[in-house]
Regions:
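Sensory coupling linkers of modular signal transduction proteins
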Residues: 38-41, 51, 149-162
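PAS-family sensory domain signal
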Residues: 40-99, 138
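Hydrophobic pocket-lining residues within nucleotide cofactor-binding pockets
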Residues: 68, 146, 162
């Protein structure tokens, strides 16, 4: 399939929500979709407190992973910063998705289920409420399944303030 090909999801797969083209992509395109996050979230940037990141803080990003066996999350420091949470504090998936606006949460859950079922990466812009600062912000969530054999066991990706 060419890299510019788009997947069309049925209403039953999207929960009736219309996803713009490009939200779902094949796993072989993962390096292209993750490149920005790896550039912006180097070990040096992630180790710095947000105030020391400077202008990069406006476009700060974080890495995330969700183990599908128990829904446990692993976040980099940048992911905590985006949500306005203390770095390293315990966070459950249920607590994390509570930060999403209702509309964004519904779209994320539908696209996440599709990505797991079809073994495809995804990109989605969502609105969240950052805890410490109390403001709403838009975040681009880029994710892809991690497979062991034919089974998807984890999702991992990048969150980027947009």
């Amino acid at each position: 399939m060419p890299s510019n090909a788009r997947v069309r999801m049925s209403d039953s797969e999207t929960g009736g929500h219309a996803f713009p083209p490009g939200f779902s992509w094949p796993l072989w395109e993962q390096p292209r979709h993750f490149e920005l996050g790896h550039i912006l979230n180097s070990a040096v940037t992630d180790a710095l407190p947000p105030r020391r990141v400077g202008a990069l803080g406006v476009h700060h990003c974080g890495l995330w992973e969700c183990d599908l066996r128990d829904q446990s999350l692993v976040w980099s420091g940048g992911a905590y910063d985006i949500f306005g949470l203390s770095r390293g504090s315990p966070i459950t998936r249920q607590q994390a998705v509570a930060h999403y606006s209702e509309h964004s949460r519904a779209r994320l859950e539908n696209l996440r289920a599709y990505a797991i079922r079809r073994k495809r990466g995804f990109t989605l812009d969502v609105e969240i409420r950052a805890a410490a600062v109390g403001d709403r912000r838009w975040v681009r969530v880029i994710g892809a399944p991690v497979c062991e054999g034919d089974a998807v066991v984890r999702l991992h990706g990048v969150k980027l303030i947009v």
